[in-house]
Amino acid sequence: MRNPLHKALWSACLCALGVSLVLLANFTHVQVGEITSTILGIIGMTLATIFLFTFFWALLSAIGYARLMSGNGVIARWHVTAGDWDRFRTFDEIRASEHLWLRNDVRIRKLTPPQGVDVIVGRASIIVDGSYHSISDRASGGRQMNWLNPPVDLECIEFPKSYPRSKGGSVELTLRVPVPASARAEGVRVFEHYRAEDKN
């Protein structure tokens, strides 16, 4: 998630709008009519319910993001140059086309930042190019964390991810992170940390 604090604020505003519509429908149902007040109430309840959950999710992400950025609970961090990130982005598109669950959970921007990309890995979360992700809720069901060795260029760590669907089932994705040669020791440290967790 990019800009989690910004999304939390927007979600709070939309949730408040939903509550306001419900109150408006309740207090003006005589003046505006039953049909209009019912429509306002339904819209308001929908907004309030959806964005209340979105607010808490974004707020927790914002707190986690701030902690990692301050260095709290960081296991490793490394920098990916713009050239390396371009190579990774090309490979990521190829890898994601192999299977639906290999699509990257990180939404890679179309334009590579000229300064490159920072990766910060914590005990339960990761920041990739400013995008915050939890990795404490990795997918189960046979899929395991993976290290992609050469000839893959760059080497990558893959974390399986699973998001529940509202209608049942789940959406399976993969959080794929490049590990440049200069940061291989840091990448190995992260891989071993989470592999040990998976065994427990």
PLM region spans:
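Polar/charged alpha-helical tracts
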Residues: 38-41, 86, 189
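Cytosolic juxtamembrane helix at the C-terminal end of the final transmembrane segment
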Residues: 58-72, 130-140, 187-194
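Generic detection of short hydrophobic beta-strand segments and adjacent strand-loop junctions
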Residues: 78, 120, 133, 173-179
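Generic "edge-of-domain/loop-turn" microfeature
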Residues: 85, 126, 133, 164-166, ...
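Phosphoinositide-binding peripheral membrane targeting modules
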Residues: 103-155
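Acidic, Ser/Thr- and proline-rich intrinsically disordered linker/docking segments
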Residues: 139-200
